[in-house]
């Protein structure tokens, strides 16, 4: 077995310890994801002459981060945890980073829940600061997949969201079973590939909202494919017709993107 196959046995998901708290590589990658997304946003604002100031953009990212964290955590609890009743009757436990007195961080986030939180935060922000909603969402469509790359690499380094069992030569040994490095597949397809397509397509954009609608379609297609290599969520398994919860939610998001595209295109005024 090569060093790559056995990488988890030679790699510590904890990067370092600071004042008694373990700092995981996932946390570092999460911060890199945020900073890279914000950096990309500022680049496209200047490059494409998008009418929003740096100060307002920084403020917007603060709003979005709150929405994403709330949506991702609540979405995970409601859909994946299997303990929704407990958490919603003990709300102080939702963001409790301690378990039996030990700091373990906040575990369990849902991408699709994050999308809901992101959209609500963006809508509220645009109403308060009188911004063009669809123009701002198009900007986010370029930044999200760029930051997403680091997020999925973080999942890989954190040794979570394992792939399905396989015999391919690049599989990763997880507790004695060779598995697909599905987190890296997702970083490549749902992150890098989607970003590159939108990056080059943005110059051909015909109406505000086109990029975010296209992002929804591209992301869900990539996620649907990657889910075939990813182990279904524990406690949920396959939902129907051999499809995972991630695939079911992606189907809904796909049609949401299609409907948004044709609605915006129909109402576009040249």
Swiss-Prot record:
UniProt-recorded name of the protein: Phosphatidylglycerol--prolipoprotein diacylglyceryl transferase
Enzyme Commission number(s) from the entry: 2.5.1.145
Gene name in the database record: lgt
Enzyme class: transferase
Membrane topology, from the record: Multi-pass membrane protein
Pathway(s) where this gene product acts: Protein modification; lipoprotein biosynthesis (diacylglyceryl transfer)
Pfam families on file: LGT
Gene Ontology cellular-component annotations: plasma membrane
UniProt-listed InterPro entries: Lgt
Native source organism of the sequence: Campylobacter curvus (strain 525.92)
Transmembrane segments: 14-34, 60-80, 103-123, 133-153, 181-201, 209-229, 235-255
């Amino acid at each position: 077995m090569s060093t790559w196959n056995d990488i988890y046995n030679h790699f510590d998901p904890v990067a370092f310890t600071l004042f008694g708290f373990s700092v995981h590589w996932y946390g570092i990658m999460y911060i890199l994801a945020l900073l890279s997304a914000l950096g990309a946003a500022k680049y496209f604002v200047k490059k494409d002459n998008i009418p929003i100031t740096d100060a307002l953009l920084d403020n917007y990212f603060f709003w979005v981060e709150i929405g994403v964290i709330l949506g991702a955590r609540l979405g995970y609890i409601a859909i994946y945890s299997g303990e929704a009743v407990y958490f919603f009757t003990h709300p102080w436990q939702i963001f409790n980073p301690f378990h039996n007195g030990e700091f373990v961080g906040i575990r369990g986030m849902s991408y699709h829940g994050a999308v809901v939180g992101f959209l609500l935060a963006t809508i509220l922000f645009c109403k308060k600061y009188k911004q063009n909603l669809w123009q701002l969402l198009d900007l986010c469509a370029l930044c999200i997949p760029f930051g997403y790359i680091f997020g999925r690499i973080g999942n890989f380094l954190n040794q979570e969201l394992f792939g399905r069992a396989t015999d391919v030569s690049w599989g990763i040994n997880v507790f004695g079973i060779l598995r697909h490095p599905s987190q890296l597949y997702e970083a490549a397809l749902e992150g890098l590939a989607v970003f590159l397509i939108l990056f080059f397509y943005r110059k051909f954009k015909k109406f505000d909202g086109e990029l975010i609608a296209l992002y929804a379609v591209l992301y869900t297609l990539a996620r649907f494919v990657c889910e075939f290599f990813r182990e279904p969520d524990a406690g949920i398994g396959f939902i129907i017709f051999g499809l995972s919860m991630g695939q079911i939610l992606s189907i809904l998001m796909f049609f949401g993107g299609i409907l948004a595209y044709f609605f915006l295109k129909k109402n576009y005024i040249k």
